[in-house]
Design a protein with these regions (language model features):
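Hydrophobic alpha-helical transmembrane segments of multi-pass inner membrane proteins, especially
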Residues: 2-169
Length: 169
């Protein structure tokens, strides 16, 4: 059957993506703004359900299988997080130079990120780090991205350096 071949599956997903793109373009943006919180919470529920109802594919227990179709909620969680973060930052009262607003923005990003890391899907979780650029552009003090980048450098260095060298230092 055509669908069982790799090319067939790709064509089905290209067609599905095209339909989804048209739907997104036709729907008024206020719909997404109005339902951003519900979309986000729904995806959080899916991320919570993955360890219990999901299947393991390529060593990652972060997939749902429906017949021959598999989906990864982490991919949709990125979009849901972007929607809710955009809605939050659109509020004229939000000031990212003040700690309470920084804390709320960090929680919006951190909750799905931690759930995804718990599903052994570190690559998808790292994509959430790119939200730091958005927050910096929207007024987050520069010390936060600097500390974040420093932490990443320290983490990667710790992976590359032998443990006994770290103990000597």
């Amino acid at each position: 059957a055509f669908y069982n071949s790799n090319a067939g599956k790709q064509l089905v997903w290209i067609g599905t993506s095209f339909v989804l793109i048209v739907c997104i373009l036709v729907i008024d943006f206020r719909f997404f703004e109005s339902f951003a919180l519900f979309i986000y919470l729904g995806l959080l529920l899916l991320l919570i359900a993955v360890p219990f109802l999901g299947v393991t594919i390529n060593g990652s227990h972060s997939w749902f299988k429906f017949g021959s179709v598999t989906i990864q909620p982490a991919e949709f969680a990125k979009t849901a997080t972007a929607l809710l973060l955009g809605k939050y930052l659109n509020d004229p009262l939000v000031n990212l130079t003040k700690f309470p607003f920084q804390w709320k923005a960090a929680l919006i990003i951190a909750i799905p990120m931690l759930l995804i890391i718990g599903s052994n899907e570190t690559g998808s979780a790292l994509v959430f780090a790119s939200f730091m650029i958005l927050l910096y552009r929207e007024g987050l003090p520069g010390a936060y991205p600097a500390l974040f980048i420093g932490g990443i450098i320290l983490f990667v260095s710790a992976l590359l350096v032998k443990a006994w060298i770290i103990l000597l230092v």
